[in-house]
Amino acid sequence: MKDESSFFTIDHIIELENGQSIRVWETPPKSDTHKKNSTIVIAAGFARRMDHFAGLAEYLSSNGFRVIRYDSLHHVGLSSGQIDEFSMSIGKHSLLIVVGWLRAKGIQNLGIIAASLSARIAYEVINDIDASFLITAVGVVNLQDTLEKALKYDYLRLPIDELPDDLDFEGHNLGSKVFVTDCLKNEWDTLGSTFKAVQGLNIPFIAFTANGDSWVNQSDVEKMIDNIDTTQCKLYSLIGSSHDLGENLVVLRNFYESVTRAAVALDKGSLDLDIEIVEPGFEDLTSTTVKERRLRNKIENELLELA
């Protein structure tokens, strides 16, 4: 990839054979930092666009990382498709396309950061993509349990023909039949399926839970880590946070700092977060957020003109 460190965000498009496309944003490492070994791929949580992680990208790039973000197919954001057709397998497919695209560009050392629902997707593929390390934040490990808590009802137990057309999840209409059918057919739903996916994990892995998370049981995350036969895993808690990592500025800053420390540590082969990092200024974070919002609006307007 071309080094365009002076430009705040580089917009890429992965064109697929079926006419769909995945939008990717690249944040190069800051020119005045020591470049890290790994390129970071951020997989945002459900109903979160890649620009929601502008602040985290700014933190990571200020500490020497090239950062890659993307919007999944059939999701909110700038990639093709509608969210009522989203499924876990489509999320998996999108992540694998982005990883393959980076490999084709000669980028070998990839660190994966995944939040919430995307963490369950990362757990599913992590043993197959030859990543350098994995970081998850409020990562879903028992999808059926999390969905029941989020939706106030266990829809995965209903027969498919009794499901409502859409489920209101995080303020978006999730196509229930598409999503639930995929969950059951491809075994995304249980804690045991997550155990199976991460069994044999042999790369460094740090998981962050939130002590106020009502959607993910920390005990389930602990069981998952205990199920991994390695000493390269560590669990940390984001004190004072709920499942919503952006609920206030204090929680958000703690999330940015903690995940950045984890990335810097893992890039050096350590699991210890007691390290110094560069913290970007509030003005830099605000400027990046505003610029990315303008870029997103510009792209959305262009897509509307083409429709």
Curated annotation (Swiss-Prot):
Keywords assigned: Acyltransferase, Luminescence, Transferase
Enzyme class per UniProt: transferase
Pathway-wise, it operates in: Lipid metabolism; fatty acid reduction for biolumincescence
Q: Name one Pfam family in it.
A: Acyl_transf_2
Catalytic residues (positions): 116 (charge relay system), 213 (charge relay system), 243 (charge relay system)
InterPro entries, per this entry?
AB_hydrolase_fold, LuxD
The EC code for this enzyme is 2.3.1.-
Extract the GO molecular function terms from the UniProt entry: acyltransferase activity, transferring groups other than amino-acyl groups
Q: Name one GO biological process term.
A: bioluminescence
The domain of life is: Bacteria
In terms of Gene3D superfamilies, this protein maps to: alpha/beta hydrolase
Q: Which family does it belong to?
A: Belongs to the LuxD family.
Q: What does this protein do?
A: Acyl transferase is part of the fatty acid reductase system required for aldehyde biosynthesis; it produces fatty acids for the luminescent reaction.
Q: What is this protein called?
A: Acyl transferase
The organism of origin for this protein: Aliivibrio fischeri (strain ATCC 700601 / ES114) (Vibrio fischeri)
Gene expressing this chain: luxD
